[in-house]
């Protein structure tokens, strides 16, 4: 009896990485510079200047009619419409992929608005879709943080797995004298190591084989995820490498509570069975009871004394990530004013207290009309006043003014034939959605993440 072993499906698994916006394009450039193998790179941007300088072999100009190559102006709704305009081009570029990584910086215009649209298209092609995005620094301001929260919420609906990198944690990791380029490289390494690790898993010859079907089992429809790679050598190399792999300080989630874990150990010919057991025990203990570990090992003589541990953990209850998404949007409540008016006033004091409260109410309303954040839900009258007043703050020369006024409805896109309500949170009146377009210093820049823009020169 003859047996035929067909390994073509495994060896020919196609992985594509698409960088969206300025930060996404920078991440793609970094991966190309680092020599990541086994994947195809795509850059998508509304900014033609940034797109022309990108090193990806496939480039997509998003919304050429809408933005004329000048960027999204830090407005997510513009990035969204630009991606919808270029839907067919995006679909053609993504076809044929088994796995698609979408990377972007959340908080700006193109990355925040276009990434969810691209993720939806990617899922419709049948590919395993993974999002790897950054949350902005706190010092970038509340408006950008709020935009990021909205973009992440949209993206979650269309990706199988989502990895969120917290830029704020770069401040805790690097020395004060660390150059900015080196600091951002640490964030890019999360994506690079994850992509390279998965590529290596499905193309290498293993003693205990892992293939693309295993990757799909762990990552399909799983939500928040952790991706990490650890390297170590010496006596306790496997233990140290495994601990490094499961404790990436930049990620918003931990492995605790993971339901699915893909664990692969690569070492030289001297890799022992007990070392493999040590790695599995560490992961199992960190993840908790009920975790399903899919385990693999491979031998690479070129590693010498070094071992490489790759961990992909999914099905995580992302409470920490949810808290992180809410944190930038918090604002002080009004306890101070309430403490003033709560005490029982005397008859002689009553008119003055009432007058003070009235003046304070006026000040609060005026302050809220120029705020970049939605007012708290405990003051419904202030929220209504803010909405009414914001129309007067729109830049009268802005091409988006008329469009924005007309689009205070569930869907922001008029020419969409179907699924019109799927990308509506960028224009809704809900306090959690993005506020109306306001004139700000961000409008002077076409870069999605201004703190990333200098990285184009490397």
Curated annotation (Swiss-Prot):
Residues 368-379 have a biased composition (Polar residues). Keywords: Cell cycle, Cell division, Cytoplasm, GTP-binding, Nucleotide-binding, Septation. Residues 401-418 have a biased composition (Basic and acidic residues). It is found in: Cytoplasm. PROSITE patterns: FTSZ_1 (PS01134), FTSZ_2 (PS01135). Its main location: cytoplasm. GO terms for molecular function: GTP binding; GTPase activity. GTP binds at residues 22-26, 109-111, 140, 144, 188. Pfam families: FtsZ_C, Tubulin. Essential cell division protein that forms a contractile ring structure (Z ring) at the future cell division site. The regulation of the ring assembly controls the timing and the location of cell division. One of the functions of the FtsZ ring is to recruit other cell division proteins to the septum to produce a new cell wall between the dividing cells. Binds GTP and shows GTPase activity. NCBIfam families: ftsZ (TIGR00065). Homodimer. Polymerizes to form a dynamic ring structure in a strictly GTP-dependent manner. Interacts directly with several other division proteins. Belongs to the FtsZ family. This is Cell division protein FtsZ.
């Amino acid at each position: 009896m003859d047996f035929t072993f067909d390994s073509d499906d495994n060896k020919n698994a196609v992985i594509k990485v698409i960088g969206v916006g300025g930060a996404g394009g920078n991440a793609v450039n970094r991966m190309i510079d680092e020599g990541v193998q086994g994947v195809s790179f795509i850059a998508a941007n509304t900014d033609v200047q940034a797109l022309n300088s990108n090193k990806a072999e496939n480039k997509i100009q998003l919304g050429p009619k809408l933005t004329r190559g000048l960027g999204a102006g830090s407005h997510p709704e513009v990035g969204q419409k630009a991606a919808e305009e270029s839907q067919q081009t995006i679909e053609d570029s993504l076809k044929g992929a088994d796995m698609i990584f979408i990377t972007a910086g959340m908080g700006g215009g193109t990355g925040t608005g276009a990434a969810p649209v691209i993720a939806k298209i990617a899922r419709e092609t049948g590919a395993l879709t993974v999002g790897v995005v950054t949350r902005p620094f706190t010092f970038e301001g509340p408006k950008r943080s709020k935009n990021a929260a909205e973009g992440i919420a949209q993206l979650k609906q269309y990706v199988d797995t989502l990895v969120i990198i917290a830029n704020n944690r770069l401040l805790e990791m690097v020395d004060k004298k660390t150059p900015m380029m080196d600091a951002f490289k640490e964030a890019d390494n999360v994506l690079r190591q994850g992509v390279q690790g998965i590529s290596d898993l499905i193309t290498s010859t293993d003693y205990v084989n892992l293939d693309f079907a295993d990757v799909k089992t762990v990552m399909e429809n799983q939500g928040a995820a952790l991706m990490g790679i650890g390297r170590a050598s010496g006596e306790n190399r496997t233990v140290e490498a495994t601990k490094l792999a499961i404790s990436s300080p930049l990620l918003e989630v931990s492995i605790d509570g993971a339901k699915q874990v893909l664990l692969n150990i690569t070492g030289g010919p001297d890799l022992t069975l007990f070392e493999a057991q040590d790695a599995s025990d560490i992961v199992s203990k960190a993840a908790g009871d009920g975790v399903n570990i899919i385990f693999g090992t491979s031998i690479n003589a070129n590693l010498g004394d070094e071992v490489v541990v790759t961990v992909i953990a999914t099905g995580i209850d992302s409470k920490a990530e949810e808290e992180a998404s809410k944190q930038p949007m918090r604002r002080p409540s009004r306890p101070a004013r309430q403490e003033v008016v709560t005490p029982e006033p005397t008859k002689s004091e009553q008119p003055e207290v009432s007058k003070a409260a009235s003046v304070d109410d006026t000040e609060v309303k005026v302050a809220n009309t120029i705020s970049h954040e939605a007012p708290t839900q405990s003051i419904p009258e202030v929220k209504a006043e803010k909405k009414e007043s914001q129309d007067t703050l729109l830049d009268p020369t802005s091409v988006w003014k008329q469009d924005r006024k007309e689009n205070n409805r569930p869907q922001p896109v008029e020419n969409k034939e179907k699924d019109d309500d799927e990308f509506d949170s960028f224009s809704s009146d809900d306090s959690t959605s993005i506020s109306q377009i306001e004139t700000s210093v961000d409008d002077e820049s076409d870069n999605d993440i201004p703190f990333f823009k200098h990285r184009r020169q490397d």
